Swiss-Prot record:
Taxonomic classification: Eukaryota, Metazoa, Chordata, Craniata, Vertebrata
Tissue: Ubiquitously expressed. Strongly expressed in heart, placenta, skeletal muscle, pancreas and to a lower extent in brain.
Species: Homo sapiens (Human)
Subcellular location: Nucleus; Chromosome
Biased composition, class Basic and acidic residues, residue ranges: 1-19, 198-217, 413-429, 568-586, 613-627, 730-761, 769-789, 799-811
Domain of life per record: Eukaryota
Protein name: AF4/FMR2 family member 4
PANTHER family: AF4/FMR2 FAMILY MEMBER, AF4_FMR2 FAMILY MEMBER 4
Quaternary organization: Component of the super elongation complex (SEC), at least composed of EAF1, EAF2, CDK9, MLLT3/AF9, AFF (AFF1 or AFF4), the P-TEFb complex and ELL (ELL, ELL2 or ELL3). Interacts with ELL3; the interaction is direct. Interacts with ELL2; the interaction is direct and leads to stabilize ELL2 and prevent ELL2 ubiquitination and degradation.
Amino acid sequence: MNREDRNVLRMKERERRNQEIQQGEDAFPPSSPLFAEPYKVTSKEDKLSSRIQSMLGNYDEMKDFIGDRSIPKLVAIPKPTVPPSADEKSNPNFFEQRHGGSHQSSKWTPVGPAPSTSQSQKRSSGLQSGHSSQRTSAGSSSGTNSSGQRHDRESYNNSGSSSRKKGQHGSEHSKSRSSSPGKPQAVSSLNSSHSRSHGNDHHSKEHQRSKSPRDPDANWDSPSRVPFSSGQHSTQSFPPSLMSKSNSMLQKPTAYVRPMDGQESMEPKLSSEHYSSQSHGNSMTELKPSSKAHLTKLKIPSQPLDASASGDVSCVDEILKEMTHSWPPPLTAIHTPCKTEPSKFPFPTKESQQSNFGTGEQKRYNPSKTSNGHQSKSMLKDDLKLSSSEDSDGEQDCDKTMPRSTPGSNSEPSHHNSEGADNSRDDSSSHSGSESSSGSDSESESSSSDSEANEPSQSASPEPEPPPTNKWQLDNWLNKVNPHKVSPASSVDSNIPSSQGYKKEGREQGTGNSYTDTSGPKETSSATPGRDSKTIQKGSESGRGRQKSPAQSDSTTQRRTVGKKQPKKAEKAAAEEPRGGLKIESETPVDLASSMPSSRHKAATKGSRKPNIKKESKSSPRPTAEKKKYKSTSKSSQKSREIIETDTSSSDSDESESLPPSSQTPKYPESNRTPVKPSSVEEEDSFFRQRMFSPMEEKELLSPLSEPDDRYPLIVKIDLNLLTRIPGKPYKETEPPKGEKKNVPEKHTREAQKQASEKVSNKGKRKHKNEDDNRASESKKPKTEDKNSAGHKPSSNRESSKQSAAKEKDLLPSPAGPVPSKDPKTEHGSRKRTISQSSSLKSSSNSNKETSGSSKNSSSTSKQKKTEGKTSSSSKEVKEKAPSSSSNCPPSAPTLDSSKPRRTKLVFDDRNYSADHYLQEAKKLKHNADALSDRFEKAVYYLDAVVSFIECGNALEKNAQESKSPFPMYSETVDLIKYTMKLKNYLAPDATAADKRLTVLCLRCESLLYLRLFKLKKENALKYSKTLTEHLKNSYNNSQAPSPGLGSKAVGMPSPVSPKLSPGNSGNYSSGASSASASGSSVTIPQKIHQMAASYVQVTSNFLYATEIWDQAEQLSKEQKEFFAELDKVMGPLIFNASIMTDLVRYTRQGLHWLRQDAKLIS
């Protein structure tokens, strides 16, 4: 190429990159490519281009595959299954993102790389992590990106019937499932290879690679894709255009290489990040939302492409080798979670899954395992396949749907799958409803869980079907873990938009597909294409959450086989709905385990209000699920609590979906989600709720099912209110909403800081599941509801509070009454505040201590794991705390005062950190405040920084090793407080109550800081006082015997002691002063005395300021009596001369937390 051409290409590439960056900033629209149509650069080969060509093959070779993308063969190839395995093997977290990305990449890979798959696979094994992934992802993804998506979907849909037929066979083999449409034989061959060993799973993964060298890379890309799904895909779709332009382009794509640089550099980083799952988890979750929408479309194509790619069995060995290297460590890591998971879900159907997770679980459920035991070995491999197929969960979903259509053939594999399917299904519905809440957290966790589950599956899972379950269980577990890894706020934030988008699709899928899964295999298969895309979206979004829903479909098929519970689900739902209701209410961590099914039912109800089938079908398996869940409650409760909260919502819907075939699955996700601490409380809570609600649960579930659409926008609050109100049927009806609300609070607690945004997104997401049409309004309503719960929108809150208060009154007389009242309160509290949950728990605990315990658990999650520790440390403690708090909050809960119900008590860490730790935190908060534009919010953040600066000074003061004095820290903090108070003048005519409350907090901080400054220098001040007093006496005596020097001294000192001098000796002193002034020009005050006087005045003035400012704060606080009375009650009042810095810090933080809640600033 001549220079001009290259310059033109460079310009174009720059434009593309700019476009990509802009698109990355905006949520990448799924349909719009990051780059313009790819072009091929024909120029002499260089190392990079030659390596790319060797990896991806010639464009001519790939051209045919690109053209044949729509061919069913490609669809039939189970390659998508393989990429997931590779992804799973790579890493749990990596797996999550890779799942999303790998779906896309797998879909893309079949397009171009198939011919060169073996070569590219071999090289890919070497370059898999870095170069290869870039090229392969770019080449195969680009080739298949635009057309691949459509073709894959079309081929997938076209092969829907065939895939269903073969899907049954494929259900046995996850690969066949993922590629259910086209190649059962290829799948079986792959399956057989899988059954050979985990290496077979690796093999399948390699096979995917061989099919599309880009696939492994696609997996690599998937992380970056997850962030840039559309952008990356565009970039990868870029290669197809390049291919079309010329075959040589692959050899040296100048533009191709450059775009790849951006994406690929991102991908390798992501892959490394994936491998370092923790570090990558956050970025992944953040990136996932933007990429999820794109992933949806991309995922669908990946299924057919993956299927075609899996055709190359010869490359499997190479790929297997690659897989083996990358997989073993992840498998090990995943196995541990798996073992934990199984204990959580001891269900026969899930036994295979559980067996994957842990032998203990398998033994626990030996009956199912007898059939699953032998399957377990093959299933481990199949599970790995499933993991990869989970990557293309949409494909799996279709395949699974097919198996459902043919439950008979799928029956045996289905049983194993049913476990996986239940889990996946639970996750699916939970992802529909709970996913909205746990959105990206769930996704990242789900994906990591999937990878983990797949790996455990390899170790001890039945055939392909358990792996999806394991994935699900692991996904749940991972979700729990990942949210922690990923800052809940960031993950939630990123998830909120994407989750909402997903929820639309997820809702459509969840209501349509999820319901189809639940209601019947036939429905699922028909809905599979749409569901696949949506599922894929959610899968990418939720890392494995949505993909799991396809897996769930598989398991659902098995479930159907088990009890044809999907069709019966509706029927059973009526009977079991009560349990669902019970479980829902107890869904708050305390009852999560036992009420997991119900919680999921509730979640399902929320998410699937449109499709009552889903709820009903979910509820049908609840009885067994309930029992099993009770068993696993302790285990699950032992699991991280935060996990429970995020996943509880997801597990709620999931459980409702998967409960019928195996309540075990819901249990598993729940137990994963449920931390140890809430278990005791949860169990008790669940038992209480069961007793109270079991009779009415059916009505409850049914009523929510029928009612949700009508009140759906306000359903969360209204339902809670109704539940609180009516002890009988009405109560039951409202209970599911409570579950929803509880799920929302749990989510909120999980992401206390991102509560507002997440609540809106979560509620919106669930609502989206219920009603796509109402999605926007619903998401708004959740926000308003959250705000209302915060007390800012008292109208809806008051309505619900009135209803809940009335219900509470009604319920209080009856044993069930207290629980419902508590639940509504708790729900309100959690809604109003993540931390408010504890206060709401208190109020709810008034009616039911156990319930309050569960609420407290959720609130603790929001508060921090510290609270969880406290809650878990003893349910009794929780109960005791609940009563005490209930004494504070019970009136507020019934009244639903905007302040009390939403006012939750923060849980403070008693550990002592270094001064640097607090200093860094303070600086971070201050910088955050500097960037804000809203003056009130800025002031709140500044005061928050002030509190951290005070903590820093306190640490300096307490730590003997600290050489620095805290005095400068306190002194500068006072200056910051003064600046903060200038932002919002409480005397201004437009000053609000919040402004005045904030001012009182500022004044009290300032006053106690002045007092502290005085006390730090008090010893010096006493010395100065003695010295100055002596000097003044001497100067006074000297002034009486006039002498210029003494006179001048007397003149210098009189002002401090002027009161003493003026009364008795005013005449003499005056004369002395006058004489001194007359002759004083030559007389000087000793410099030492002058300095002492200045220092003395400065130190004592601190005390004067402290008293004056304290009085000012006390006067102003009288205007905000309710707020500060409640704050004093919760935290203990601040006492001017007795409160220490720690008391001030906690008091102020609690007040700031409530101010944020009132102002809806909590995110």
